[in-house]
Amino acid sequence: MLNVVILAAGLGKRMQSDLPKVLHTLAGQPMLGHVLESARDLQPGRIVVVVGHGAERVEAAYAGQAGLSFALQRPQHGTGHAVQQAVPQLMEGDGAEDATLVLYGDVPLVQPETLRRLMAARGQGVAVLTEVLPDATGYGRIVRDAQGQVTRIVEHKDANEQERAIKEVNTGILVAPTAKLKDWLTRIDNNNAQGEYYLTDIIALAVADGVTVSAAQPAASWETLGVNSRAQQAELERRWQAELARRQLEAGVTLADPARFDQRGTLECGRDVYIDVGCVFEGRVKLGDGVRVGPHCVLRDVEVGAGTQIEAYSHLQQARVGDEARVGPYARLRPGADLGNQAHVGNFVEIKNAVLGEASKANHLAYIGDADIGARVNVGAGTITCNYDGVNKHRTIIEDDAFIGSDTQLVAPVRVGRGATLAAGTTLTRDAPADSLTLSRIRQSTVPGWKRPVKKS
């Protein structure tokens, strides 16, 4: 069974942040979360995250997850020293018989398919993930013999002129037999320009011990890009968003402009979905067949039924929208909003913890909170469900086929019967009976000949 070690102890000084570097987000989740997802896709027996700077915050973010443990590296003396801190946990049980894969918490986008290719290249030996770069400055170089076999890795600061001319570089990611890895880590030294214990030094030891060292390459160059600064974080964000957009396009989604699309979670789309510019999708979002999302909308943890249109500048969070519905523009669906098929929610309407039944409409300037609204109900402009008494929330019930006039306040708890009509301007404090007109306002009167006051000189 596979062990995975994730190195996440670095300070991230260039990030200029109090937040541990691996907790900075990419596409809506911490970088470490991306690495953990890829690692879990391999179904390892254990994952050990090596923490250091900000250890308490990193552990708190992922504590309690099955198969995940932490090892502390303090102080930090290099990547080899970091892996040494995980060795005791790797050797527990039958761990010594396993292989260990080493990943990095600030290299967030290495894909499971690439890691499987690396595992396949290993055989019974060691495999390193390498890449050929036009400018290899700053990277460790892969040194091969005349037969093309990997013999060692030399860090840039320790490389001579001939070695610096090599374009194949080490990404840092490798897999090795656990028992041998433990032995090699005890034999490395810090006799180098940095005065650190390099994990890469195990390659020369493996070769000296007659262990085959193989190499594999990622499918895309962005998979092995690390993040050490805000600029690199922003660059990698755009590269990953471009990849996510490409995947949506290949799945049949129409994106008005792939460069202005942001997916910060999972986005599942049916057939013939159209997404306009500037939209943001967070958490888990599911769009049914034929859904159209207008420009600059935000959808977070939302399910949208087939044929529904979300108009411009609408914000939906933890909500469900049925088939053939209309939402927006400038609508807000808050947590617990549940719209039935063919429901309409128009501009400047806010719905929270409420059901709007099939073919019901709230087209203008309304607040509907803690309400159960039946089918074919018309909610007039300016309607408010007064659901909060200062301490507790109360529900409003509006039955099928009711008509709620404009500028109406429903003071919960209150019920509007089936087919009832509330006259415009009504403040409802008691239940309104079915099939009746209910109104509460003073009788209109006129004062003939009344004059407005005149400003005194």
From Swiss-Prot:
The active site is at residue 364. UDP-N-acetyl-alpha-D-glucosamine binds at residues 7-10, 21, 73, 78-79, 104-106, 140, 155, 170, 228, 334, 352, 367, 378. InterPro entries: Bifunctional_GlmU, GlmU-like, GlmU_C_LbH, Hexapep, Hexapep_transf_CS, MobA-like_NTP_Trfase, Nucleotide-diphossugar_trans, Trimer_LpxA-like_sf. Its main location: cytoplasm. Pathway: Nucleotide-sugar biosynthesis; UDP-N-acetyl-alpha-D-glucosamine biosynthesis; N-acetyl-alpha-D-glucosamine 1-phosphate from alpha-D-glucosamine 6-phosphate (route II): step 2/2; Nucleotide-sugar biosynthesis; UDP-N-acetyl-alpha-D-glucosamine biosynthesis; UDP-N-acetyl-alpha-D-glucosamine from N-acetyl-alpha-D-glucosamine 1-phosphate: step 1/1; Bacterial outer membrane biogenesis; LPS lipid A biosynthesis. It holds the Pfam family NTP_transf_3. Binds 1 Mg(2+) ion per subunit. GO terms for cellular component: cytoplasm; membrane. Residues 252-457 are annotated as: N-acetyltransferase. It catalyses: alpha-D-glucosamine 1-phosphate + acetyl-CoA = N-acetyl-alpha-D-glucosamine 1-phosphate + CoA + H(+); N-acetyl-alpha-D-glucosamine 1-phosphate + UTP + H(+) = UDP-N-acetyl-alpha-D-glucosamine + diphosphate. Its cofactor is Mg(2+). Keywords: Acyltransferase, Cell shape, Cell wall biogenesis/degradation, Cytoplasm, Magnesium, Metal-binding, Multifunctional enzyme, Nucleotidyltransferase, Peptidoglycan synthesis, Repeat, Transferase. Acetyl-CoA binds at residues 381, 387-388, 406, 424, 441. GO terms for biological process: cell morphogenesis; cell wall organization; lipid A biosynthetic process; peptidoglycan biosynthetic process; regulation of cell shape; UDP-N-acetylglucosamine biosynthetic process. Mg(2+) binds at residues 106, 228. It is found in: Cytoplasm. GO terms for molecular function: glucosamine-1-phosphate N-acetyltransferase activity; magnesium ion binding; UDP-N-acetylglucosamine diphosphorylase activity. Homotrimer. NCBIfam families: glmU. In the N-terminal section; belongs to the N-acetylglucosamine-1-phosphate uridyltransferase family. Catalyzes the last two sequential reactions in the de novo biosynthetic pathway for UDP-N-acetylglucosamine (UDP-GlcNAc). The C-terminal domain catalyzes the transfer of acetyl group from acetyl coenzyme A to glucosamine-1-phosphate (GlcN-1-P) to produce N-acetylglucosamine-1-phosphate (GlcNAc-1-P), which is converted into UDP-GlcNAc by the transfer of uridine 5-monophosphate (from uridine 5-triphosphate), a reaction catalyzed by the N-terminal domain. This is Bifunctional protein GlmU. It comes from Bordetella avium (strain 197N). The lineage of its organism: Bacteria, Pseudomonadati, Pseudomonadota, Betaproteobacteria, Burkholderiales.
